[in-house]
Amino acid sequence: MLLVGSGAKFVQQLEQAGALAIYVTPEGGSEGHYLRRLRGAGYEVVTLSSKGIGDLASYLTRIHGVRPATLGKSERRTYFFPALIEQYRATLPPKAKGLVFWFYEGHVFSQQELSYLVKLSREDKGVKFVVELGRERSIRWQPLQSA
């Protein structure tokens, strides 16, 4: 059985760093413990897949277009969605500490995209990022700028 700590150190380091790189176990399940700890600390957590996002800056901070797959003879359309950060910030409860975006499959991000997440977390103190960068035998994390 995997022995998991209280998660208080994880929340504290996320608040200090703003963005964390996390390495989870291959069998999974342990990250749910840390998600619950973040929610218990007053954060609203949004889990997203890193694959298929496209331009990360547009996706998080600007109105961006999304084109669904064309199936045969249907016409090509573009739908426009608001910035993801503003969309979730509008629905935050009044007592929430902020938003945490948890990206799984984060190994597909380039180094430039990871540094953008660090920069964005420093500019906007109400937004934090956790990126799953790989697998290890036991769960560990470190600040994203040193990953």
From Swiss-Prot:
Single GO term (MF): oxidoreductase activity, acting on NAD(P)H, quinone or similar compound as acceptor
EC assignment: the record states 7.1.1.-
Annotated membrane topology: Peripheral membrane protein
Q: Which EC class, in a word?
A: translocase
> Catalytic activity annotated for this protein?
a plastoquinone + NADH + (n+1) H(+)(in) = a plastoquinol + NAD(+) + n H(+)(out); a plastoquinone + NADPH + (n+1) H(+)(in) = a plastoquinol + NADP(+) + n H(+)(out)
Q: Which Pfam families match?
A: NdhN (PF11909)
**Subcellular location(s) per record:** Cellular thylakoid membrane
UniProt keyword terms in alphabetical order: Membrane, NAD, NADP, Plastoquinone, Quinone, Thylakoid, Translocase, Transport
Gene Ontology CC: plasma membrane-derived thylakoid membrane
Q: Which InterPro entries match?
A: NAD(P)H-quinone_OxRdtase_su_N
Task: Tell me how this protein assembles.
Answer: NDH-1 can be composed of about 15 different subunits; different subcomplexes with different compositions have been identified which probably have different functions.
Q: Which family does the record claim for this protein?
A: Belongs to the complex I NdhN subunit family.
Q: Which HAMAP family match?
A: NDH1_NDH1N
PANTHER family recorded: NAD(P)H-QUINONE OXIDOREDUCTASE SUBUNIT N, CHLOROPLASTIC
> What does it do?
NDH-1 shuttles electrons from an unknown electron donor, via FMN and iron-sulfur (Fe-S) centers, to quinones in the respiratory and/or the photosynthetic chain. The immediate electron acceptor for the enzyme in this species is believed to be plastoquinone. Couples the redox reaction to proton translocation, and thus conserves the redox energy in a proton gradient. Cyanobacterial NDH-1 also plays a role in inorganic carbon-concentration.
Name by which UniProt lists this protein: NAD(P)H-quinone oxidoreductase subunit N
Q: Which gene is transcribed and translated to give this protein?
A: ndhN
